[in-house]
């Protein structure tokens, strides 16, 4: 399943995160400009990028779990399509109209059949109930469609952070100086936001 794949991604990111932590914290013997720039690059760019990737996949998993449960609690236990509901409501409305026509015809007779009228009225009432319930489901479905994007609200921001991190990671290596060049602080807002979310997660 998609959730299983995402969880595998998260596990891989966490392993990379552990390796980076060991490189930046537990390798005091490594020195020199290249190693120092690599440590700074790892802690300030790669670590937030891995965190953003983990947070993104976790947000997708959470949204995938929440969407069906929200649908069941807000709309119905079965899958509904708006076009089907609209068609069924229109059909119920036509049936109600037909029953009303038959009732009117019966009333216009010289000797109306009151038993038949009563049966038609009962059938009309039942069909009105069906129509009302279908309209309620349609209203709930449309309300759910309007609110469901909120379930995925965090994903767009995290995806943007991942893209910025990837872009910066691809541009950080300076081949002429053989060092990693950190982006200016003004371009690291994504990392600050990710680190803040990471602290909330922990």
Where are these regions (language model features)?
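Intrinsically disordered, low-complexity charged segments of secreted bacterial virulence
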Residues: 1-202
């Amino acid at each position: 399943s998609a959730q299983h794949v995402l969880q595998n991604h998260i596990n891989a990111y966490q392993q990379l995160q552990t390796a980076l932590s060991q490189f930046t914290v537990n390798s005091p013997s490594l020195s020199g400009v290249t190693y120092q720039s690599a440590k700074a690059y790892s802690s300030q760019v790669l670590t937030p990028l891995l965190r953003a990737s983990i947070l993104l996949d976790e947000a997708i998993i959470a949204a995938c779990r929440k969407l069906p449960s929200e649908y069941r609690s807000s709309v119905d236990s079965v899958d509904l399509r708006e076009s089907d509901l609209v068609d069924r409501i229109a059909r119920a409305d036509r049936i109600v109209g037909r029953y009303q026509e038959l009732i009117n015809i019966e009333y216009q007779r010289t000797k109306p059949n009151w038993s038949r009228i009563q049966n038609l009225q009962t059938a009309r009432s039942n069909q009105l109930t069906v129509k009302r319930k279908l309209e309620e489901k349609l209203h709930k479905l449309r309300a759910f469609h309007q609110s469901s994007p909120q379930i995925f609200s965090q994903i767009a921001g995290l995806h943007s952070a991942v893209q910025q991190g990837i872009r910066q990671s691809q541009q950080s290596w300076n081949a002429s100086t053989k060092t990693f060049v950190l982006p200016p602080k003004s371009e690291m807002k994504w990392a600050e936001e990710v680190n803040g979310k990471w602290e909330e997660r922990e």
